[in-house]
Design a protein with these regions (language model features):
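Alpha-helical multipass membrane-protein architecture
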Residues: 2-7, 12, 18-759
């Protein structure tokens, strides 16, 4: 059993949008909810007998959250050091096993598939760590008892479980390219077709995966060993793994079994519901309440339907709300209300934006959420007009937050320089056989690695890998994407900078801002290509390729560093984690490209801008495409009124950060709206996602307030299963579309607007 306290409570981090378990390509904001690691730090040595009428699993959970530690068990206060060795567990002689890598990578496939589906819909992606940890335990633990060792049997402990979850994360976190920059390349006519470009897609994924992976090793040294950053979600994963393997009491075993059962049932239920609902979407999936009221005689209410206000019974975003909390969900909702309930209608009323009539027979039924427009400057659609304020305010908000962390980054740079100089001088003295008496830099002792030397990643392994991946990036960029070597080097430098920012932010607040600040790379690359005077299409391709390299490589480095934190706490071998990350990333490259080709085959609109995409909103794609056009065009293709609004909201967002940090006490930060969430509401036209999220957030809040012990067991497992299940349901739906047995062929239009199929 584990017990601990993390320096980030639900209230303290709730103001961030969903990342570690859930992240957004556009908001870059992660998951704030880490339910199983926040508890009292008092240590008690008392016996706590179970009431015969009480659920043993809840009693176990209550002992975790109340501070009571049953006799003979370990109490842990998380100070960044590895958990103490549990004398009740056997020694793990083998951590890097084929079963851990294969099972972990397959679980990463599930999350990767979910990320492709959900990312194309909203720009959201989800981390695979906790999902891989729990499901990996559920699969391997029973097999370890019944199979011979040669076939995957043998003891399965927490260290190997850490290897499973890092393989899952490595394999499942490479889909960001395919829900943002890559579709944007096709929309701009810069690529041919996914099947024809499959080699280029593979190499682009490879260079973004391995550069970030190798760079995570030195980041571990500084941020995990020396700074001892909290990393809330990876720490939650470590505590979860330890609790799953706690077999000292019947209550602990029952609690672990309940989490597994909840996760499995919610996953299967969500997958089934998503797949079946496409055959009657107007009844089972989308409730177009305002359309129903219109057909019953309330003619004026058709305008609400035109602006996309209806309810979708989406398990994934109900689960996302459970994980994100009230602040993140309501900030998203506030942005949607402002954009699609206030500003948008005012724009249309004043003739600043224009929609497309849906039907001549139904006056007032107009599509306002489409990106299509014949003249983006003089006759923009509301969605195009609102895109720029949304993107700009998120960028301003994120950089304002980073600015307040500038002293920390400067301290990190100085400390890294001092430590490196000390190491080089020490090595030089040893080579010459001289005595080295120079005093160690302040805090240098904290860099001592608790892992034995044979479990540490050799210097040659990550340095050689880093250099090879850098060379590969330049070679692939030049020969396959006509990328200038100077632009390629700049993209690698930006990835380096973004990785530092992302790990620092993720390690302290669980917020990874890379999705937003990657827009800065597009601005930098756009300036370089303009100065070079290269043709427009080459400039656009360079912008998207270099921007995706900087963003995806840095994002992967942040994910890998978080996994190394989980392994550090569990005393897992860093070199075993390292090779698992390489294997998982290698498998993930094939899976990510294959999944994108599958979806592009089923839904041609993903790569053809002329086809209206009713199944996917693609907000991240729209943002990357629009920014690319803007930074490479001779004049900015932004309506003047949209630009003014963007500047005003950007100033307001930055000012909020200043006021929050300088004058508002920390305990009140949870009441301050999250501007990343507000901006997301501008970028994502689907208002039913924040509606589902606030319902999920309120359910989780009420549950945790009234029955915290039950919530600790149920909330995350239920939410994770709902999210992954709908994502896999989306993959199954894509397969059904390809074989022509999907809902758009055999489904019913009952209760859909205009009596046309709405699935």
């Amino acid at each position: 059993m584990v017990h601990g306290q993390v320096n980030a409570t639900r209230e303290g981090v709730e103001a961030n949008l969903p990342v570690a378990v859930m992240s957004t390509i556009e908001s870059g904001a992660p998951l704030a909810h880490v339910p199983s690691i926040v508890s009292q730090n008092e240590k008690h040595d008392i016996e706590s007998p179970l009431d015969e009428k009480q659920d043993p699993a809840l009693a176990y959970s209550e002992s975790r959250t109340s501070g009571a530690v049953p006799h003979g068990e370990l109490a842990i206060v998380n100070d960044g050091s590895p958990f103490p060795v549990d004398p009740n567990l056997p020694e793990e002689t083998s951590q890097l096993t084929w079963r851990a890598v294969i099972i972990g990578s397959l679980l990463g496939l599930i999350v990767g598939a979910s990320n492709i589906y959900l990312g194309l819909k909203t720009g959201f992606t989800f981390g695979a760590g906790l999902f891989g940890a729990i499901f990996g335990f559920a699969i391997i633990k029973p097999l370890s008892h019944v199979l011979p060792e040669k076939l995957g049997g043998g003891y399965f402990g927490p260290k190997e479980n850490a290897v499973v979850q890092t393989a899952a994360t490595s394999a499942g976190s490479l889909t960001g390219l395919f829900v943002a920059a890559v579709p944007a390349m096709y929309h701009l006519g810069l690529m041919k077709t996914p099947k024809e470009d499959i080699g280029r897609l593979f190499t682009l994924t490879i260079i973004t995966a391995f550069y970030g992976l190798f760079f995570a090793i030195p980041l571990r040294k500084y941020y995990i060993l020396k700074q001892r950053l909290v990393f809330p979600s990876p720490t939650a994963t470590a505590f979860t793994i330890r609790s799953l393997h706690d077999t000292t009491t019947p209550a602990a075993r029952i609690a672990a079994a309940k989490k597994i059962k909840i996760l499995a049932v919610s996953f299967v239920g969500s997958l089934t519901f998503k797949t079946v609902s496409q055959y009657a979407p107007g009844i089972l999936w989308d409730w177009h309440i305002f359309w129903w009221l219109y057909t019953w005689g309330w003619k004026g209410i058709i305008h609400a339907e035109s602006w996309g206000w209806f309810i979708e019974l989406t398990p994934a975003f109900f689960g996302a709300g459970m994980l994100s909390g009230l602040n993140a969900s309501w900030s998203f909702m506030l942005g949607s209300i402002l954009a699609w309930g206030v500003i948008g209608p005012v724009l249309v009323k004043q003739g600043k934006a224009f929609g497309i009539a849906q039907s001549e027979e139904i006056p007032g039924w107009i599509a306002y959420t489409s990106m299509s427009s014949k003249d983006y400057i003089n006759r923009p659609s509301p969605r195009y007009w609102l895109l720029w304020p949304g993107v700009f305010l998120m960028v301003c908000y994120s950089f304002a937050e980073i600015a307040f962390s500038a002293p920390i980054f400067w301290s990190a740079i100085k400390s890294g320089y001092r430590d490196t100089r000390y190491k080089l001088r020490e090595a030089q003295a040893r080579r010459k056989g001289q005595e080295f008496n120079e005093p160690k830099p302040e805090g240098y002792e904290a860099m001592e690695d608790p892992a034995p030397p044979h479990e540490q990643v050799p210097l040659w392994a990550w340095v050689a890998g880093l250099l090879l991946s850098m060379v590969a990036t330049l070679v692939v960029g030049h020969f396959q994407f006509h990328l200038d070597a100077g632009v390629g080097i700049v993209s690698l430098l930006l990835a380096f900078i973004f990785a530092f920012i992302g790990v620092q932010s993720s390690g302290t607040t669980d917020v990874n801002p890379i999705g937003v600040i990657a827009k800065a790379s597009q601005l930098v690359i756009g300036g370089i290509t303009k100065a070079q005077g290269i043709p427009l299409h080459e400039a656009q391709l360079a912008n998207l390729v270099a921007g995706s390299v900087a963003g995806q490589a840095a994002s992967h480095a942040v994910d890998m560093t978080g996994d190394l934190k989980t392994g550090h706490l569990l005393r897992a071998s860093p070199v075993a984690m390292f090779w698992s990350q390489i294997a998982g990333s290698f498998i993930g490259i094939w899976l990510s490209v294959g999944l994108f080709v599958l979806f592009a085959t089923a839904y041609p609109c993903l790569t053809n801008l002329e086809i209206e995409c009713t199944s996917f909103g693609m907000p991240a794609v729209s943002a990357w495409r629009s920014v690319t056009i803007a930074v490479t065009a001779p004049t900015l293709p932004i309506p003047h009124s949209s630009g003014m609004c963007a500047i005003a909201l950007g100033i307001a967002a930055a000012a909020t950060v200043v006021v929050k940090h300088l004058w508002i006490p920390q305990k009140y930060h949870k009441w301050i709206p999250n501007w990343n969430g507000i901006g997301l509401g501008f970028v994502v036209p689907q208002t039913y996602y924040p509606i589902a999220m606030i319902v999920g957030a309120h359910v989780a809040y009420s549950w945790e307030s009234r029955r915290p012990q039950s919530a600790e067991i149920w909330v995350f497992a239920l939410a994770a299963g709902l999210i992954a299940g709908e994502g896999m349901g989306g993959v199954l739906s894509a397969l059904l579309t390809i074989v022509k047995v999907s809902g758009d062929i055999y489904g019913s239009p009952v209760a859909c607007p205009g009596w046309e199929y709405c699935g």
